[in-house]
């Protein structure tokens, strides 16, 4: 089993547990160049809020898009957008990535922004 399939297996297991709980989930995806965050409805059919470093308005204020500072900025923005839609409590879906570095920075910034995990 290679690294990617192991990560996807971990992600599927986590998503199944979150869907069983029936709460909104904050889904994070990272690439070497960008980081993405989405708040997804409990049934999985609707994206309630989204933010990423691909967005020109967010990326122009950042020094780089693939670093911890960018993840912190995305965490703050996703918390703000989710709260504007009436979502304050989410389950954190790290998509099989280690809870470390950029993923942890995004989660901490979202908590500081008012989201409860």
Swiss-Prot record:
Keywords carried by this UniProt record: Ribonucleoprotein, Ribosomal protein, RNA-binding, rRNA-binding
Any single biological process term in GO: translation
Binding partners and assembly: Part of the 50S ribosomal subunit; part of the 5S rRNA/L5/L18/L25 subcomplex. Contacts the 5S and 23S rRNAs.
Function: This is one of the proteins that bind and probably mediate the attachment of the 5S RNA into the large ribosomal subunit, where it forms part of the central protuberance.
SUPFAM superfamilies, per database record: Translational machinery components
GO terms of molecular function: 5S rRNA binding; structural constituent of ribosome
Cited NCBIfam families: L18_bact (TIGR00060)
Organism: Thioalkalivibrio sulfidiphilus (strain HL-EbGR7)
One Pfam family in the UniProt entry: Ribosomal_L18p
Name the record gives this protein: Large ribosomal subunit protein uL18
Sequence similarity: Belongs to the universal ribosomal protein uL18 family.
HAMAP family on file: Ribosomal_uL18_B (MF_01337_B)
